[in-house]
Amino acid sequence: MKLDAPFNLDPNVKVRTRFAPSPTGYLHVGGARTALYSWLYAKHNNGEFVLRIEDTDLERSTPEATAAIIEGMEWLNLPWEHGPYYQTKRFDRYNQVIDEMIEQGLAYRCYCTKEHLEELRHTQEQNKEKPRYDRHCLHDHNHSPDEPHVVRFKNPTEGSVVFDDAVRGRIEISNSELDDLIIRRTDGSPTYNFCVVVDDWDMGITHVVRGEDHINNTPRQINILKAIGAPIPTYAHVSMINGDDGQKLSKRHGAVSVMQYRDDGYLPEALINYLVRLGWGHGDQEIFSREEMINYFELDHVSKSASAFNTEKLQWLNQHYIRELPPEYVAKHLEWHYKDQGIDTSNGPALTEIVTMLAERCKTLKEMARSSRYFFEEFETFDEAAAKKHFKGNAAEALAKVKEKLTALSSWDLHSIHEAIEQTAAELEVGMGKVGMPLRVAVTGSGQSPSMDVTLVGIGRDRVLARIQRAIDFIHAQNA
């Protein structure tokens, strides 16, 4: 049989990996980690990375899921050299190989009815035998190829399949455990396990990195690869990701979709850094640049044990990257969250200034956008607890006095604003907090914000003065 590569197979490329998700749902964190490990291994070895969409499940695959997967890969910045390739567009190729296998006696048509197969399974279960096809049709010459049938791969019956898993070591499966796999359905569509084999062959895949739930597929795929004379890639089956309670990761542990983490305010760098450490390590190092990941990553350092997802650790990493990445870069991601929350940022400080002001205070960009609304739009009410605590005593007098001094400023800058607040406190013979806290609630609506001088510069003179007057009126109304 001949190779039919969908792209030019550069003979100088010694490592070619692939990420091959099924578009039946979003890109979840387990799939994202698999994609990352596969991508890193290719980059570490100056190789190529292929994106393949395994959409043979026609009933469950959707264009929306495909778009979500590609969006997730792009957001994580895991670019591919080849693809995306779609299995549904390669059915002619798969059927060509199947027909050749039938001609060469490597596969055969099976005309058994569903009733016959159920009866066979029932008998085997009663006899406490492993359910498997009995090759009833292997030498059948009484049916026409035009009659309804499936095609089965003629699996070897002797010996074992042995492969050295790059993560788990030597794995051996007896061929007596394997059935004659259906490789083409009655409707003429090829099955998943077969399509994978042909694709890995045609695309020159040298290393298959995937979840441990695929281990049972591997011996079947190896036998087909051997039958058609294709090279056997190196397999690496990575462990599953559990929640922090040891149970399989699910929605009850929080977000499981990659794009949900984007929506929740995480930077892609934080999620990538977290995922790479979720089953792989390099000494005690926790923070990795993209370049360091590529330089250090090896499959034999990937853990065989399941990993536990810890949201607090992810938040810690996210805050690190919010602080350490250039404000211009963080601001681009922050802008999405303002739009998502319906906040118009056209009338207010530059988003880079917001990042600089709030980087130490916020764990997520969603929190940063939500907690900085007052820079761009008016708030409806004062926080009840903050107003009750700080709009009492001589708060109205302090606000009136500081408003007077702020109004008189010739320059609206940090130093001048700080001096105005300081002078107000001195003249009233009170601590800075007796002026600063009522002022904070007056201009932000809450008791939390960056330092007052920074906050007031960001909000702008006209808004600040109007909000102080509003607070004074509010206090008088409350005391009336």
From Swiss-Prot:
GO biological process: glutamyl-tRNA aminoacylation
GO terms of molecular function: ATP binding; glutamate-tRNA ligase activity; tRNA binding; zinc ion binding
Keywords: Aminoacyl-tRNA synthetase, ATP-binding, Cytoplasm, Ligase, Metal-binding, Nucleotide-binding, Protein biosynthesis, Zinc
Keyword Cytoplasm found: yes
Keyword Glycosyltransferase on entry: no
Coiled-coil regions listed: none
Motif 'KMSKS' region per record, residues: 248-252
Subcellular location: Cytoplasm
Cofactor: Zn(2+)
Catalytic activity: tRNA(Glu) + L-glutamate + ATP = L-glutamyl-tRNA(Glu) + AMP + diphosphate
Entry's cofactor comment: Binds 1 zinc ion per subunit.
Pfam families with a match to the protein in the record: Anticodon_2 (PF19269), tRNA-synt_1c (PF00749)
Residues bound to Zn(2+): 110, 112, 137, 139
Broad class of where this protein is predominantly found: cytoplasm
Enzyme Commission code(s) on record: 6.1.1.17
NCBIfam families per UniProt: gltX_bact
Family: Belongs to the class-I aminoacyl-tRNA synthetase family. Glutamate--tRNA ligase type 1 subfamily.
PANTHER family in alphabetical order: GLUTAMATE--TRNA LIGASE, GLUTAMATE--TRNA LIGASE, MITOCHONDRIAL-RELATED
Quaternary structure and partners: Monomer.
General function of this protein: Catalyzes the attachment of glutamate to tRNA(Glu) in a two-step reaction: glutamate is first activated by ATP to form Glu-AMP and then transferred to the acceptor end of tRNA(Glu).
Name used for this protein in its record: Glutamate--tRNA ligase
Organism from which the protein derives: Haemophilus influenzae (strain ATCC 51907 / DSM 11121 / KW20 / Rd)
Native organism taxonomy: Bacteria, Pseudomonadati, Pseudomonadota, Gammaproteobacteria, Pasteurellales
